[in-house]
């Protein structure tokens, strides 16, 4: 991963311990700064007033908190991008996630290349937005 990717924090809120360990290990192996949250309240405190971050969560967390999880996260960090780890048979959950502007839903087996590609795409999008802001400031 490049230097700009390392600046974007990855927040992990995953109920399945095996999947959580896998994602945290994936972040470590790729020099990504990852932070885990014990629950939604802790996550909201960590992301509050951030301009951007990646949040990786699984369907267990969404099932535990319901659809309000999306609004809580969006209010705390409007610039955060969510990646949802879910199963293909959870179409209702996927539909709900899309309706709440989740960046992507990733299906098992949560391949390393797929997770990293999503993170890279988010970082590229953030970088482009930052460049546009800089350009607008120069125009003024």
Role assignments for model-derived ranges:
Residues 92, 110-119:
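C-terminal output helix
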Residues 2, 6, 124-140:
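CheY-like receiver
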Residues 68, 88-104:
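Alpha4 helix (beta4-alpha4-beta5 surface) of REC/receiver domains from two-component response regulators
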Residues 38-54, 62:
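Acidic, metal-coordinating helix/loop segments flanking the phosphotransfer/catalytic sites
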Residues 20, 53-75, 90:
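Conserved phosphotransfer microenvironments
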Residues 14-38:
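Two-component/phosphorelay signaling modules centered on CheY-like receiver
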């Amino acid at each position: 991963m490049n230097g700009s990717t390392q600046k974007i924090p990855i927040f992990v809120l995953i109920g399945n311990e095996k999947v959580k360990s896998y994602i945290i290990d994936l972040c470590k192996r790729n020099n990504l700064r990852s932070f885990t949250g014990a629950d939604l309240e802790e996550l909201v405190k960590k992301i509050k007033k951030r301009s951007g971050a990646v949040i990786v969560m699984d369907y267990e967390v969404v099932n535990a908190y319901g659809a309000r999880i999306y609004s809580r996260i969006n209010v705390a960090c409007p610039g955060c991008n969510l990646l949802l780890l879910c199963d293909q048979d959870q179409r209702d959950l996927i539909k709900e996630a899309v309706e709440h502007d989740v960046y992507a839903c990733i299906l098992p087996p949560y391949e390393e290349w797929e997770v990293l590609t999503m993170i890279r795409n988010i970082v590229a999008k953030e970088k482009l937005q930052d460049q546009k802001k800089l350009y607008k400031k120069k125009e003024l």
